[in-house]
């Protein structure tokens, strides 16, 4: 048995319940993680409120970002072994996976090793802003070396990630923010 956060109706944080559930071993292409830290993000609160790109199937699990140690590896989970320090990457449906819990499974394509220099909290919270920025700049805008772009809200987590992504591809970011104190 493990503690898992689920919800049974759309709503605010009060609909979240900590429940004891039997956790099956990881399936094909899955890694099971003993969670040490969680990241909280807007997508999860939107999912809980029924405002996300997909609607929850009840009872619903929740959570995109977590860090912990590998507890078990399912068939096809090459590259991971029990005890590895890993983070989940928000690249899965919360209707199939949710990482708010003590012991969770995630698809192997959405699990990454992380360096020992990161705390569990840092490792659990580094992905969402980069995936958001990458999707907008690379997948949609097709940003390339030599391009110039304006980044509004550049001091936000996504804005900071967008600056780094632009620099990485050789583009020139122009950063905007509301106040000088947010430099």
Q: Where do the protein language model's features map onto the residues?
A:
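Mid-domain Rossmann-like dinucleotide-binding core that forms the NAD(H)/NADP(H) cofactor-binding site
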Residues: 124-183
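Short N-terminal binding/cap micro-motifs at the start of the first secondary-structure element
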Residues: 11-18, 42-43
């Amino acid at each position: 048995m493990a503690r898992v956060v689920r919800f049974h109706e759309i709503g605010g944080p009060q609909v979240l319940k900590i429940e004891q559930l039997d956790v099956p071993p990881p399936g094909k292409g899955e890694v099971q993680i003993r969670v040490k830290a969680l990241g909280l993000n807007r997508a999860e609160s939107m999912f809980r409120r029924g405002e996300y790109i997909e609607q929850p199937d009840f009872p619903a699990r929740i959570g995109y970002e977590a860090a912990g140690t590998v507890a078990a590896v399912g068939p096809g989970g090459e590259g991971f072994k029990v005890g590895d320090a890993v983070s989940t990457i928000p690249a899965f449906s919360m209707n199939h996976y949710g990482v708010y819990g003590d012991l969770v499974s995630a698809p192997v394509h959405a699990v990454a090793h992380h360096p020992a220099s990161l705390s569990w909290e840092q490792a659990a919270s580094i992905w969402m802003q980069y995936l958001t920025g990458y999707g907008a700049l690379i997948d949609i805008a097709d940003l390339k070396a030599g391009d110039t772009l304006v980044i509004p809200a550049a001091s936000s987590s996504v804005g900071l990630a967008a600056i780094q992504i632009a620099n990485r591809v050789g583009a020139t970011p122009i950063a905007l923010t509301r106040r000088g104190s947010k430099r």
